[in-house]
């Protein structure tokens, strides 16, 4: 008994094909640091983008030291990865208020806004990915007569 051995040619998926076909982006020259602000929840982040090697300095700490959560790190790097500029700029940021999630969202918004000032033709891609939208959700205030914003005390009929 002989079995026919079929050889399959594996076509690259669209993601692999586009990643292989993407030409390396030419370096962008900026004459001064780009400064932007991002906000989310109670967090406010001021960012300075300068030409460099992809280093993050967040209040004097590295990205990994300030945000140990890998999800937050990916969230922050997403705009730079999208426009293929992860190793083109150094990011210096001052973070105020909020918690880790709010600060990460504010930092992502500030970086995306800075990238537009550097290269305006990147705007449609950043806009489509949702990186330029300021998330308006914030904590709802507590109302008197209630235990929390919407939680009412237990009701007793008799």
Swiss-Prot record:
Region feature (Disordered): 1-20
Tagged with keyword RNA-binding: no
GO cellular component, one term: small ribosomal subunit
Start-end of Low complexity biased regions: 10-20
Molecular function as annotated in GO: RNA binding; structural constituent of ribosome
Cited InterPro entries: Ribosomal_Su5_D2-typ_SF, Ribosomal_uS9, Ribosomal_uS9_bac/plastid, Ribosomal_uS9_CS, Ribsml_uS5_D2-typ_fold_subgr
A single GO BP: translation
Key words, A-Z: Ribonucleoprotein, Ribosomal protein
Any matching Pfam family: Ribosomal_S9
SUPFAM superfamilies assigned to the protein according to its UniProt record, in alphabetical order: Ribosomal protein S5 domain 2-like (SSF54211)
HAMAP family for this protein: Ribosomal_uS9_B (MF_00532_B)
Membership in a protein family: Belongs to the universal ribosomal protein uS9 family.
Name of the protein in its database record: Small ribosomal subunit protein uS9
